[in-house]
Each structure stands twice: as C-alpha cells, then as structure tokens.
Regions:
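Acidic/glycine-rich phosphate/pyrophosphate-binding loops and surrounding catalytic core
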Residues: 2-206
C-alpha cells in the first residue's frame, strides 16, 4: 500500500509482455487495407507496361546496419505463388549491403506491392533499431524500456511488435489493458482521490492502478 498525495493506493507489480509474433490473419487484413489505400489493383503504370507472364526476383538489401524487423510477416504480404526466402531472423543485425530476403514470382504482383511492403519494413526496422540502442544504454540498470500508446494510428500492433523485436517491452496494448490515471482524468474526476476511489469501487479485477 502506498500513499500518493494523501490517497492510499495498493500497488500491483505490472508484468510487461513482448509482442514478438503477429497473427497472420491480422497482418493479411491490414496489408489488404494498405494496398487498397495505395490503389495497387489499379496500378496503371505496372498494369499497362508489364505483361502478366513476366516473372521477376526482388532482393531486399540493408542499406545500413539495423535491427531487422518484419521479415516474418513477408509471407502474409503476398498471395500464393510468390516465393519468399529470408536469410536472417527478426531481431538479428543486418549489415550494410547484406541480402535480407529474396522474393520471386509475378512481376506485376511484386511491383504493385513493393512500396507498401518496403514502407512498412523500413519503419519497423527503424523502430527496432532505435529501441535496441535504448536497451543497450540501459542494460546495466534495473529498469525496462517500454513503449507507449503514442503510436501511428493503424500501425499500433506493428510498431509494438518492432519495439519487442528491438528488445523493449510493451506497455498497454490499448485502453482496456490497464488503468493509467493522467492529469486530464484527475481534472475531469474532480481530483486524484475520487478518480482512484471510483476505479477501486468498480471492482475491475484485471485493472492495475
């Protein structure tokens, strides 16, 4: 039991998790919406310049040293018939000019998806790399690197996944995960004490204050 600003609060030790795997169906649905946003099916440049019979091989190469994140979701970004070969695992260090993966199949399919897929992978690798830097700076201290809910709308689970791959921990996945009283709650509830009391009286068994 702790006293915060005169309010008695029972402290529960929070157990922070790591979202190191993304559900395949979730990824496919998100990628589908990203592709629709980009108009991939109506890619007039590719559709009018590349014959449907043309095959190609795309090579993913690291431009600089980074913590790789997102290769595990590549199979969910392309339809059947596209062959994906990864040479490194999520969480591993990619070296400059290192080949991370190869993608083989229909040139049209690969070309009308490449920008969406690359944008996502580059973002995830960037987050994982920056997280790893923070983790390495704090490895001699007794605390964990956590993310927040201040994430890109529509990309939350992907970005939390990247944090976990980089060695960090995930805080609240969403608003239903745990109680987190902030200034605006205190003001709206009429003070810290009534805010805490209302939550305690609600008997939310899974909530952490």
């Amino acid at each position: 039991m702790s006293v915060i600003n005169g309010v008695k609060v029972k402290r529960n030790k929070l157990q922070f998790s790591r979202l190191t795997n993304l559900d395949g169906q979730y990824v496919r649905e998100k990628i589908k919406s990203f592709l629709q946003e980009d108009g991939s099916e109506d890619d007039i440049t590719t559709n009018y310049s590349v014959d449907t019979s043309i095959k190609m091989e795309a090579v993913l190469i690291a431009e600089e040293e980074c913590v790789v994140a997102g290769l595990s979701i590549l199979p969910h970004c392309f339809p059947k018939g596209i062959i994906i070969q990864s040479f490194i695992m999520d969480g591993d260090i990619g070296k400059p000019n290192e080949v991370l993966a190869r993608i083989r199949g229909s040139a049209r399919t690969i070309l009308n998806r490449e920008r969406v897929v690359l944008n996502l992978l580059q973002r995830l690798c960037g987050i994982a790399t920056k997280t790893r830097q923070y983790v390495e700076c704090t490895q001699n201290y007794n605390f964990k690197v956590l993310d927040t809910r201040k994430m890109t709308p529509g990309l939350r689970m992907f970005e939390k996944f990247a944090v976990a791959v980089g060695g960090g921990y995930n805080h609240r996945l969403d608003l239903s995960t745990a109680v987190l009283i902030k200034d605006n709650h205190i003001i709206s509830a009429g003070g810290l004490e009534p805010a805490v009391k209302k939550i305690q009286d609600s008997k939310i068994g899974r909530a952490h204050v």
